[in-house]
Amino acid sequence: MGGSNSDFKEIAVLRHFLLSTVYTQPAHLYVGLYTVAPTDSTAGTEVPNTNGYVRQIVDAWTFSGTTPTQAQNTSLITFPAATPAGWGTIVAGAISDALGSGSGNILDWFDGLSQLIGINGVAEFLANAITLTQD
């Protein structure tokens, strides 16, 4: 999987360390699914909040001692079944700070996915399937 930090996150980190601007950690982080991948500066096209879609909470992360600039999700993430219609082909995902589709700020994004979610299809990320890198 490829991907990157969003410009929003990079700016927040710089402001925090260089200007003493406090960034308040969100209560939860959410993973969303995209039919057009976001980039560092664009939002992409997220699956809309219809047909059973809702971003999923992903608050548990593991940091590696050998690669401390990376974090991975620690548990299975399962989206509800797509019903009554499918969501299309999922090509990317993103971690954001808000629950609603298209809301909040993208913090990190990842591409390299290619999964068609048809009627009653379910999207999942196994534990350790999402790797975020601070580079």
Located regions from the model:
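Small cysteine-rich, disulfide-bonded extracellular modules of the LU/uPAR three-finger superfamily
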Residues: 1-93, 97-135
